[in-house]
Amino acid sequence: MTEHITNVEQGIVLFKEGNFEQAVGILEDASRRFPGSYEAFVYLGAAYAQQGRHNAAIGALKRASEIKPDSPRIHYNLGQAYEAAGVPREAWFEYKKALELDPKYGLARGALINLSQRLPRLLGSTIEVAA
């Protein structure tokens, strides 16, 4: 357990310092060694996103959401990755899921409203955002 914390925490520190390349290396190792660590996958996905590796970010964040499906933060970040990858419909569903889990999650609400306003034809007229 201590090894897990040290390994994942090291990757998180590197990420927060903006050293995304090193963070990816540490977090990839942590995610292989500790496949049940949602934190390793969340930060790995975020580091990939910072590198512009949006498909890799989606994969890591999807794994994080499988481990911890009730996290609105993970669904919001997954929505951000889908949006950056040019997959707005999936982004919309992830933002919506984040709001279902936490109706007061302002970032997810703002992202959902923004996406809905920018892409009305793609998303269809039946999509509603609760006020």
Model-derived features: positions:
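Structural signature of tandem alpha-helical TPR/SEL1-like repeats
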Residues: 16-29, 50-63, 84-97, 119-131
